[in-house]
Amino acid sequence: MTRRQDGTGQGRVAVVTGGGTGIGRATARALAADGARVLVVGRTAATLERTAAGHQGVRTLVADLTDDDAPERITSAALDAFGRLDVLVHNAAVVLPEPFGAVTREHARLQVETNLLAPVLLTRAALPALAAARGTVVAVGTAAVQGRRAFAGMSLYGATKTALDFLVRTWAVELAPWGVRAVGVAPGETDTGIGERMGWSAADIARHQAEAAARTPSGRVGRPEDVSWWVVRLARPEGAYANGAVVTVDGGASVV
């Protein structure tokens, strides 16, 4: 269910990467409900179309963020479709859990290129357009729980998310002369459907979520809409004094 917004995003344009499922889908829909026009980017046309279905002003672009031409393609697609770019949401991520001794070069490269290098290069490509709009970069997944605690099998994923957190803080300083600000949202355990996509059984998913809920003061795992609500508000012009901030949305899991 998409939470109702109040329309203060009217006229703005946003790009959301990883917009085909989970938090990315919820964010694209929430931005559209807030009045923004949105370009959702992902690798699978069918999931992107499901995100856009029933939401006027949402367009889709199939792109692999690790392709050399992806940053320019995405930026050009947004400008060609809407004429401006106000909000860039970095949401796409790859997680490949495996013991450190089993990490392959291919898996390491894929996580680093998708989770870290892609936001760097896309932000660089979009910077002139963002500067023209005095826009905002929002990084989702910055130093989430996996980036603050040690979890076996999650070393590379956690490292990329911690690095993204540092990028947000550095961008706040470096992009300020351009009139562009950077903020982050750090979700805790969120029911994004990733378990199903990774082939987990229903019993394994239920057990994992029950364990996560038990570790969380709020007593449940998050919903994608819990996270997208914060993305929308941080991206609004009214939130412009938030710069370099990373908001943790984890039900209190990181404080226990």
Question: Which residues fall in each region the model found?
Answer:
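C-terminal substrate-recognition "lid" of short-chain dehydrogenase/reductases
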Residues: 120, 129, 220-249, 254
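A glycine/serine/threonine-rich, flexible loop-to-helix segment
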Residues: 53, 177, 189-216
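Catalytic loop of short-chain dehydrogenase/reductase
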Residues: 136-163, 168-177, 189
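Short, small/polar-rich loop/turn modules that mediate ligand/substrate recognition or access, typified
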Residues: 89, 176, 181, 242-244
